[in-house]
């Protein structure tokens, strides 16, 4: 796989941390040309420093909810580096709280970044990807397979990403383009710790206990996730599962489309995120 990405133009959103940063570092090691972006300017600068100066790099700061910024960014990438070979839509956010406690504008923000951000990036770069017979990689989640209490907004956004990506793959069948839907399980990133809590669970669990519960679920490193994604993208796999937990959840959700929640509760044990007693 080491030569597949050499000199390929790779666009990565969410490159300031987590999976996005790990993808940037791994691709840089393989000689890729990088276009990195994030809303977090400080984190993005740190990623650029980690990548080093041996690769051609663009780095831009913008909000995935800004449609005009994304359209301009796609033009800038093509004019500066050339048409993109790979686009990795990684950027995302979440919140904590049940639907009844979550303001509508908070739901809209999560959808705007997680779903519409992916749609905007896909639209903006699609002509470039088609011209290169490249690959579009959209990050969904295991929460694109199952509902999960306290994550109404996040699950809705990730189901939407999955549906959009799988349908786009059907529409572009025969074009030579790869369309990948990626479903990570628990990844050791800061997305949960950065999440705003609209309301904590009624079981009295503190924010620290919730963060600890997320950490316990995070069984896969960003570096491992990046390697799995790149291996799958190189093969233009339509669905990429990351982690043993993702494989289990995918299987259980298909075998028990209605009763999976009870099965997964037994599998995972008591969980302060779900509102169970600690």
Can you name each region flagged by the protein language model?
Residues 122, 157:
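Active-site helix of classical SDR
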Residues 30-46:
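Conserved glycine-rich Rossmann-like NAD(P)H-binding loop of the short-chain dehydrogenase/reductase
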Residues 2-34:
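Canonical Rossmann dinucleotide-binding motif of NAD(H)/NADP(H)-dependent dehydrogenases/reductases
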Residues 41-42, 61-72, 104:
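The beta1-alpha1 cofactor-binding region of Rossmann-like NAD(H)/NADP(H)-dependent oxidoreductases
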Residues 174-244:
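SDR active-site lid
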Residues 98-99, 103-108:
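Substrate-binding pocket helix/loop in short-chain dehydrogenase/reductase
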Residues 141:
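Residue(s) in the substrate-gating loop at a strand-loop-helix junction
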């Amino acid at each position: 796989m080491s030569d597949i990405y050499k000199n390929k133009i790779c666009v990565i959103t969410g490159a300031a941390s987590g999976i996005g940063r790990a993808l940037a570092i791994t691709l840089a090691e393989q000689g890729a040309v990088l276009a990195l972006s994030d809303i977090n300017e400080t984190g993005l600068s740190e990623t650029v420093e980690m990548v080093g100066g041996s690769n051609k790099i663009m780095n831009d700061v913008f909000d995935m909810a800004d449609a005009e910024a994304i359209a301009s960014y796609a033009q800038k990438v093509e004019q500066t580096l050339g048409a993109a070979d790979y686009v990795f839509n990684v950027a995302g956010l979440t919140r904590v709280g049940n639907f009844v406690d979550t303001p509508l504008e908070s739901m809209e923000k999560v959808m705007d970044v997680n779903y519409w951000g992916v749609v905007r990036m896909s639209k903006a770069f699609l002509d470039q990807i088609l011209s290169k017979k490249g690959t579009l990689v959209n990050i969904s989640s295991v929460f694109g397979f199952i509902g999960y209490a306290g994550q109404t907004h996040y699950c809705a956004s990730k189901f939407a990403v999955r549906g959009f990506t799988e349908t786009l793959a059907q529409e572009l069948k025969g074009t030579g383009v790869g369309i990948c839907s990626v479903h990570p399980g628990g990844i050791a990133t800061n997305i949960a710790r950065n999440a705003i809590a609209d309301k904590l669970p009624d079981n009295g669990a503190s924010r620290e206990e919730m963060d600890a519960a997320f950490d316990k679920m995070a069984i896969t490193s960003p570096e491992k996730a990046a390697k799995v994604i790149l291996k799958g993208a190189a093969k233009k796999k339509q669905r990429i599962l990351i982690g043993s937990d993702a494989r289990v959840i995918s299987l259980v959700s298909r075998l028990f489309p209605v009763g999976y929640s009870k099965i997964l509760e037994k599998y995972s044990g008591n969980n302060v995120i779900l509102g169970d007693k600690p």
